Each structure stands twice: as C-alpha cells, then as structure tokens.
C-alpha cells in the first residue's frame, strides 16, 4: 500500500510539473483581482513618497516596462520607433554567436540608424553613430555594441514620453498591479503542496504550485518547535536574510527565493524548483566527470559565486550535494543556511563541511571573506574529477584528520590532469589566502581568466547556451522515495511550547521579492488578467456613463486624495459600510448609497488620527469631539499607510492654521463646513491624480 501511495504521489507531482510548464495560467486555481482604477489616487501618492514614480524605477521593473512598452507602441506614435529600436538592441545582445551578431548588427544599423540619417531625422548623437560605425568597419560586434544608443533612447523616453505615460490609463494599471504586489500576505492556502523532495535539520522541502499563477516552486518548511529545540533561531533568520540578498538581479545559478512567510508552526521559503537531483547523487550514479564536463559545472558555479560575492555574501558550504540540477542539466547553488554577510564585519566561525573548508575557516579566531569559497571550489572540482575530496584520502571519516590534512598537506595532483587544470586547482587550493586564485584583488574575474576556461565565452555561460554534459531523465522524480526520505519523530518536540516571545522573533519574516513576483506574473497571468480587467472596466464605464464616476467629484477641486474605504461610525451599526472618500485640506467627505449628500467631517471636529486593530485588521481611528469615534478600514496595506499619513498631515496643517489666525471675539464657529466654502489650505494637485 505504501508503494502505491508513493507512485501516486510521484504521478501527481509529475503531472503538475508538465501542466505548469505548458500552461501555468490554466493551472491557476485562484484569480488575482485588480483593485478599482480609482486606486491610482492613493497609490500614486504612496509611490511618489517613496521615490518610485521615476522613469528609471518604472522602466527597470518587469510590469512597469511591459505597460510602458504597451503605451508607447499602441498609444504614442512618436515613441514607437524608440521602443522598437530598444527591443531590437536587447535581442541582439542575447545572440549566441559572432556570425549572428554580424548579420543582425548590420540589419539594425540599416533599419534604425542609416535610414534615419538619410532622412535627416536621426535623434541621436554623432558620437553614438561613430561608435557603431567604427566597430562595424572593423567587423567588431561585441554584445554591448549599441550601448550608447541604449543610453540615448532612455534619455529620449525620460521626458515628455514618460510624463504622457504617467497621465495615461497604463500608469493607472501599473498602480493597480503595484497595489496587488504590496498587499501580498501568503498562507499555506495560496499553494497546492505535492510530494516531499528533501529533508534537512529543521524541516522538509516539498514541490508546490502557487494557486494564483500556476507556477511550480519548492517549499522549504522549517518547524518552529524544532528550531527552538536546537536553538537555531539565528540560523533560520540568517538564511532568510541571505536569500533576500542574493535573490535580486539576474542570476540563473543560485536557487533563489521568491517569497517567505510563516504560520503559527512553520517558517516557509518559496524557492526555485530544481528537478534534476544534485551533483553528489549524479557523481555516485554517473561516476567521475571528465575535465570537459567538470569545466561546464565549474563555469556555472563560478558565476553563482560571483553573484553572491558582489553582494558581500560568502557561501561557506560549497560541495556537490549543494549543487542542484534543473530539468535541462544546468546547475544552481542551493541551501544558504551557512552563508554570511561580510560587508560590515568579516566572519571567523568554523562552519562548513569537513573536506571542503578553507584553512582560514578551520583556524579559530581568524577572520575571512569570500576567499573561503574559492578554496572550497577547488576541493569540489577535485571531487568531481576523482570521486573524493583532496583531503579525504582512503575514505577516512575522521574529521580531525581531514582538518589536519587541510591545514598541512600539500595536495598532489595526478599526472593525468592537463597543465591548465593543474594551474587552476593549484591556484584555488593555495593555503595562503594572499596567493590564492580569486583572492588577489579581482575576485571571480581572476578565476574566469584561468587558461582552463580559455575556450569559454562567459556571456554564453551566463545565457546557459552551452549543452550540459548530463541531462536528468524526464518523467522521473530525481529525488529519493518519500518513504526513504522519512519524517521527523513528533515525540522529539512534544514538550516544546511556542511562546509569544518566540513568535515575535519572526514578526518581520514575511517577504516578497518584487522582481521575482513581477517575473512570475509576466510569465503566467499578466496578459489574461489585463484583458479580463479591461473588459470589466469597459462594462462599468458604459454602465456609469450617465451616472458619472466617483472620481469625477474630485476633478477641479483641491482634493488631496480620494478612494474607497469602509467605515464604521454609527454606534448602532457593527457592519462595515463601503464608501468613496475625498480628503480636502479642511474636511473628509464621503459618498455612497444611503448617505446624506453632504456627509463630512471637518478638521475642527477631529481630535486625533490613530491606528487601531479590529479582529486582527489594522484600521484608522478618528477621535471626534464629544467622545465619539469614526473607524475606517482600507482594502490594502499601502492604502492604510497613505490614508493615515494624509489625514494626519491635513489635520496637523489645519491645526497650525487655526493657531495662526487671530480668534474672532464673540463669534461662534460652526462645526460643519459647507461644501461651497473655500478650503482652508490648498495641499497637493488639483485632483489628487
């Protein structure tokens, strides 16, 4: 029966994988719902306050670029040639061979440069043209040939074109997507969890599918009780920090994190899913690798280490078991549990795996940095070629003996190794850090320039264009059987109680890596959801054509901000009422079904603007004169933050104005401001957009 369950688990997992690759959006069991377009008023202010409404910030984001591109290609004739030129250059930069670049560079030059020069309408500098002409004249076609044009295209898009984008519906859509992104609160219900694929000291790793996009991931679940029992809180939190540091920027050679969240019992990391097993497993199945095969793995691992080291992260646990293969055979460095940030202080702890640890790591009290990883790389490459670490002779398992040999033994390299390989390994396995390859001041570049890698084009390595020496079998789960992986004994943690103080440690644990979420959405449901939302909004516009839109009331007035909130201000009502609110310098108005035409609170009536919590939801509490209160609930975190800020600012400015104006004797002040009266102070733009 157990065997049947294992087979069914494997079949279910493999089917989910195949469907996710083919049509991930069709596998989405939840739907992302974009907020109303009116969210723009709040989100634009929220993003502006954080310096996010700039050309550079929006153009560099995946969804921002896609919406900006759509606007330029379909709604702004003068910008279309610039964006088309930009996209052709980006395609050129990814070409694999020089022959392809020669042909494509000439096509780009003829279509986008020479054609415009002949028409006397070339909007670029003479120096950019001469740069490209000079290289083409010498038949030089580097990947960055058109870089001067990239800079000038962006400069041309940065001004009026970008401003028109900000004023368009496409920027409104960007605000809608950013609101969704900034309000992500993941739980286990957001994933379909499949079979177990691994186990570690604190928990298990499962294959899983994200419900709203259909994308497959690995879910690493750490048990909070087991962490507490082993006093591993610092390690668990450190892994989250290290993953957040390395998971930004384009690096296909590290198992990166897209999300982190926690439940009352578990910490969960959502990671890249690697289906091809690890190099330790394949070394045992395949036998030792040839120099050529090892060169492939070494090159991709070097780029992974370079990505970490550029972010001041030392990995400290490089070994074949931590190098995972994807379904195509390319590799990624996994498990950053022992990684360390050395940007402010160098580590000196002796951590890692015996047989791969650098001498400076083994020596107590000695500080080190990325140097440790280059020594470990030498040990690992030796193992791929010989089947054992250079310091683990005769399969000894005595850790002290292995460490002693690491500190004292001169490594003897077999005569069968090529001179280039010997040079590489001798450089990496130098006990003296000051003489070690990769530690002489230029980091990974020194290793990449080794004669052993002379035949490689590092751009092609980065683009994963070289064929892997080993392709994992398709249609198989390249992981141990679920029953062989086993499970933890629940009795171990039976007496462990999680206190509020334990949970407080993980208060800031949840995280969404923005660029990885945007990439996931772009690859799966972006077009579908945009099309569906366009249809819904078009129907709503047609329906409301005669009635008018809520936003229209703010037009031409000194409205600071407007949008939907839910209120609970009547002492006899316990239900939330969704209304459309308008914040002016001297009052807060709202409209909705069943409301009086002049529903408002003046700033004179408000005594304070505070944050409170009702049924675990953060809310705004407006304390009103006479002991009354007015409670507001927002649909998302950014809205709550921005409404609180703007309400407090308006209240503070109104108070300051009252203090500056001399009090008029014997003239009572009305607590209600008529809508027709001139506002006290003008803050913000005319319509808050």
Curated annotation (Swiss-Prot):
Keywords: ATP-binding, Cell membrane, Cell projection, Cytoplasm, Kinase, Membrane, Nucleotide-binding, Phosphoprotein, Serine/threonine-protein kinase, Synapse, Transferase. Disulfide bonds: none annotated. It catalyses: [beta-adrenergic receptor] + ATP = [beta-adrenergic receptor]-phosphate + ADP + H(+). PROSITE patterns: AGC_KINASE_CTER, PH_DOMAIN, PROTEIN_KINASE_ATP, PROTEIN_KINASE_DOM, PROTEIN_KINASE_ST, RGS. Residues 54-175 form the RGS domain. Its EC number is 2.7.11.15. The record marks 3-4, 10 as: Required for receptor phosphorylation. Changing residue 3 to K: 95% reduction in phosphorylation of G-protein coupled receptor rhodopsin. 60% reduction in phosphorylation of beta-2 adrenergic receptor ADRB2. Does not affect binding to ADRB2. Not activated by receptor binding. CDD domains: PH_GRK2_subgroup (cd01240), RGS_GRK2_GRK3 (cd08747), STKc_GRK2 (cd14223). This is Beta-adrenergic receptor kinase 1. It comes from Homo sapiens (Human). The lineage of its organism: Eukaryota, Metazoa, Chordata, Craniata, Vertebrata.
């Amino acid at each position: 029966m157990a065997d049947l369950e294992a087979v069914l688990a494997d079949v279910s997992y493999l089917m989910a994988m195949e469907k996710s690759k083919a049509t991930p959006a069709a596998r989405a069991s939840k739907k992302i719902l974009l907020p109303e377009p009116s969210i723009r008023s709040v989100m634009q202010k929220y993003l502006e306050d954080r310096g996010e409404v700039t050309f550079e910030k929006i153009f560099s984001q995946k969804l921002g670029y896609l919406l900006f591109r759509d606007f330029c290609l379909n709604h702004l004739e003068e910008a279309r040639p610039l964006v088309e030129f930009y996209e052709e250059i980006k395609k050129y930069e990814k070409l694999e061979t020089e022959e392809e670049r020669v042909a494509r560079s000439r096509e780009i030059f003829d279509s986008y440069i020479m054609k415009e020069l002949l028409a006397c309408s070339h909007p670029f500098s003479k120096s950019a043209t001469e740069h490209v002409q000079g290289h083409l004249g010498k038949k030089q076609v580097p990947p960055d040939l058109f870089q001067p044009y990239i800079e000038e295209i962006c400069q041309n898009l940065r001004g009026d074109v970008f401003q028109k984008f900000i004023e368009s519906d496409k920027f409104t859509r960007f605000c809608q997507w950013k609101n969704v992104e900034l309000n992500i609160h993941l739980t286990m219900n957001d994933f379909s969890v499949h079979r177990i694929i691994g186990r570690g000291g604190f928990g298990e790793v499962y294959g899983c599918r994200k419900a709203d996009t259909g994308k497959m991931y690995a879910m690493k679940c750490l048990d909070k009780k087991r962490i507490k029992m082993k006093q591993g809180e610092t390690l668990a939190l450190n892994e989250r920090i290290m993953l957040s540091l390395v998971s930004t920027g384009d690096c296909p050679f590290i198992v990166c994190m897209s999300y982190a969240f926690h439940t009352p019992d578990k910490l969960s990391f959502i990671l890249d899913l690697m289906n091809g097993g690890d190099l330790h497993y394949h070394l045992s199945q395949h036998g030792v690798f040839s120099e050529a095969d090892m060169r492939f793995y070494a090159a991709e691992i070097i780029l992974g280490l370079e990505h970490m080291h550029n972010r001041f992260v030392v990995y400290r646990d490089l070994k074949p078991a931590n190098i995972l293969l994807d379904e195509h055979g390319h590799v990624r460095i996994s498990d950053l549990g022992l990684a360390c940030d050395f940007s402010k202080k160098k580590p000196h702890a002796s951590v890692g795996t015996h047989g791969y640890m650098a001498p400076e790591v083994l020596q107590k009290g000695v500080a080190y940095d990325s140097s440790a990883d280059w020594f470990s790389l030498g040990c690992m490459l030796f193992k791929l070629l010989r089947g054992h670490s250079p310091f683990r002779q005769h399969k000894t398992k005595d850790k002290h003996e292995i460490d002693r040999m690491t500190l004292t033994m001169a490594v003897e390299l077999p005569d069968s190794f090529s001179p280039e390989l010997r040079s590489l390994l001798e450089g990496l396995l130098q006990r003296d850090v000051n003489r070690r390859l990769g530690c002489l001041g230029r980091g990974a570049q020194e290793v990449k320039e080794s004669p052993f890698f002379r035949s490689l084009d590092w751009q092609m390595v980065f683009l994963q264009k070289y064929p892997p020496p080993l392709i994992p079998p398709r249609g198989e789960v390249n992981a141990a059987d679920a029953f062989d992986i086993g499970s933890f004994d629940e009795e171990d943690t039976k007496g462990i109680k999680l206190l509020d103080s334990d949970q407080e440690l993980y208060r800031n644990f949840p995280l969404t890596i923005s660029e990885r979420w945007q990439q996931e959405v772009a690859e799966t449901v972006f077009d579908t959801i945009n099309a569906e939302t366009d249809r819904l909004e078009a129907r709503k516009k047609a329906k409301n054509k005669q009635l008018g839109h809520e936003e229209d009331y703010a037009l031409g007035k000194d409205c600071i901000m407007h949008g939907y909130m839910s209120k609970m201000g009547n002492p006899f009502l316990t239900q939330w009422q969704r209304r459309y609110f308008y914040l002016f310098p001297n009052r807060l108005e709202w409209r909705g079904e069943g409301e009086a035409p002049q529903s408002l609170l003046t700033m004179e009536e408000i005594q304070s603007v505070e944050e409170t919590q009702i049924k675990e939801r953060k809310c705004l509490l407006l304390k009103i004169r006479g002991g009354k209160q007015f409670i507001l609930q927002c649909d998302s975190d950014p809205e709550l933050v921005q409404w609180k800020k703007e309400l407090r600012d308006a209240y503070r400015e109104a108070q300051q104005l009252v203090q500056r104006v001399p009090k008029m004797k014997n003239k009572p002040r009305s607590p209600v401001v008529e809508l027709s009266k001139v506002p006290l102070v003008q803050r913000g733009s005319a319509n808050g957009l």
